Swiss-Prot record:
Originating species: Anaeromyxobacter sp. (strain K)
HAMAP family according to UniProt: Ribosomal_uL4_B
Keywords, ordered alphabetically: Ribonucleoprotein, Ribosomal protein, RNA-binding, rRNA-binding
GO cellular component: ribonucleoprotein complex; ribosome
Alphabetical list of SUPFAM superfamilies matching this protein: Ribosomal protein L4 (SSF52166)
Top-rank taxon: Bacteria
Record's protein name: Large ribosomal subunit protein uL4
Region (Disordered): 48-97
GO biological process: translation
Amino acid sequence: MAKFDVYDLSKKKVGELDLADAVFAGEVNEHLFYEVVKAKLASDRSGTHAVKNRSLVSGGGKKPWKQKHTGRARQGSTRASQWVGGGKAMGPKPRDYSYDVPKKVRKAALRSALALRSKDQKLVIVQEWKPGAPKTAAAAKVLAALGAKKALVVDDAANLALAKSVRNLDGSDFLAVEGLNVYDILRHDALVLTADTAKKLEASLS
């Protein structure tokens, strides 16, 4: 088990938390990051790109000139791909770029990302963070005190006040613990978890 300091919102140590080495202090595998982030970015692509081929371009039904005895190359339509205004040959079509990554690989990559933030001392665990009302300025002050200005804050989805407080901060975001992913961990400088969230991650990733 690895020991982690637990802080209050002013970064005063209030206790310690034992968490599984396999989840928070394991090996960092950068290749898993590549596989999972590549799949995430691929699934985010809209895939709506499309061009018109010769059957979709309007016009061109009439043969431009007779087949023989003109001295010119034979042509069947002014909408063939070699003509200006013609259809595109073998152009892009709408497609789905998403593909599945095995669940074991996704979990291993998430464990590796947590271990990376822990190794870099960019993982901050707070006892709890439950603002009474959404206050962006207050959230900015807390993150500054924690030394995590551009941070990903993770807690229960029900903590709407915290979500609204953090989402307006430049460079910081809030995620529900169920939606935590490698891509969002890596694109933020620091990771802030509540003690309950850390325990939930330990249980789900062990």
